[in-house]
Amino acid sequence: MPNDPSDNQLKTYKETYPKPQVITTSNGAPIYSKTAVLTAGRRGPMLMQDVVYMDEMAHFDRERIPERVVHAKGAGAHGYFEVTHDITKYCKADMFNKVGKQTPLLVRFSTVAGESGSADTVRDPRGFSLKFYTEEGNWDLVGNNTPIFFIRDAIHFPNFIHALKRNPQTHMRDPNALFDFWMNRPESIHQVMFLYSDRGIPDGFRFMNGYGAHTFKMVNKEGNPIYCKFHFKPAQGSKNLDPTDAGKLASSDPDYAIRDLFNAIESRNFPEWKMFIQVMTFEQAEKWEFNPFDVTKVWPHGDYPLIEVGKMVLNRNVKNYFAEVEQAAFCPAHIVPGIEFSPDKMLQGRIFSYTDTHYHRLGPNYIQLPVNCPYRSRAHTTQRDGAMAYESQGDAPNYFPNSFRGYRTRDDVKESTFQTTGDVDRYETGDDHNYEQPRQFWEKVLKEEERDRLVGNLASDLGGCLEEIQNGMVKEFTKVHPDFGNALRHQLCQKKH
């Protein structure tokens, strides 16, 4: 008999609810029979008045909603964040206002490229999205398991995803397209090296890091801003999968990561992460050798050390995956007082695109769904109506300002002010210091055996590409380090013979 909680979910339900509920139609009417349609005689035709069938089938025809265009396959869980260290000198956000304070949260982990039925153990970045239900609104930190990303300008995102997804004619994944994109956008090299290193296939979701990746801005009660980055380190340690083992799991247990997370929580082996921040003053940002808002780069820990903030604990599985995970909507635009945006071009682009895709996928009132609503800070807006609206602010005035005590503003949540200069233009950033940090990753972070595996992993996927793509990628990695390019060229040549 299976021993994992995930294998025994139905048995657990039976034991939890010994008395079955009377089955009903969607309008709550009890049903006499759910095993036969209504017909005129034993062999006669169905009747249009069979509302039990019509009710069931009409809803079944509409069960699916649009799949996420990226991050379609994922797992979710509930938990809490607890402050363990005081950072109020940096941030006035309510959830950080005292040590020991706990804030409920929802997390969603995911792969990026695959569809909702794809395997969990592929070489792919992992989504690491958090929704903090704070007393001053929901804060969504929508990150990944790497501190960097492939591109630094949001205009490239649709084309990157097109190259990552299926070929429009063959409907197959096309490594030529993906490596061609990376070859033509060399700012991606840093993240490509992360992806093809040992870190590229985490061992499930419990043993991977999490990062906000972008540069954000924190503001304290005095109104003083500082730039920051968010980091999450698993208390249970970091582990990755060997590519051979990952390939076997992809066929034998494609839901490996989802299963592992569910069973750990159900067995009360609660996953935990420590949260850290890095901070950079405005003066330091002006003097730094790189663009501090470039998401293809990291802030060196030696110059900007990690500052511990608190811990995140996942202690409750979802009751219904569709309601609590599939309908969950994480959005970088959802910030709270004390957390603000930086000029990071990718972050600025995501502020729009995530909201827009939620409107498409879930409708204009997605924020009213229980999993998305700011239940600890009731929303008071002038937004009204729209499809599936069930919370339309009652009889309050639907305009602002008004003379009828409808709403008021708060002076203490004013955004910080900042200066900006420069000509309005489209600034190409494709050649902005693309190789220095990848070179440090090769020379100082990776050990010799890790470099060998990085080269081998790249050669394995590049081996199926056109020769011109192979040569182009070898050229790019040679710019990182001659040894890197030579080793990759050697392995690709061996595959040809």
Curated annotation (Swiss-Prot):
Cofactor(s) required for function per UniProt: heme
Keywords: Heme, Hydrogen peroxide, Iron, Metal-binding, Oxidoreductase, Peroxidase
Record-listed E.C. numbers: 1.11.1.6
Stimuli inducing this protein: Up-regulated in response to Cu(2+). Up-regulated in response to phoxim (an organophosphorus insecticide) and carbaryl (a carbamate insecticide).
Catalytic activity reported: 2 H2O2 = O2 + 2 H2O
Described function: Catalase involved in the oxidative stress response serving to protect cells from toxicity. For instance plays a role in defending against oxidative damage induced by excessive copper stress. Not required for maintaining normal lifespan.
Protein name listed in UniProt: Catalase-2
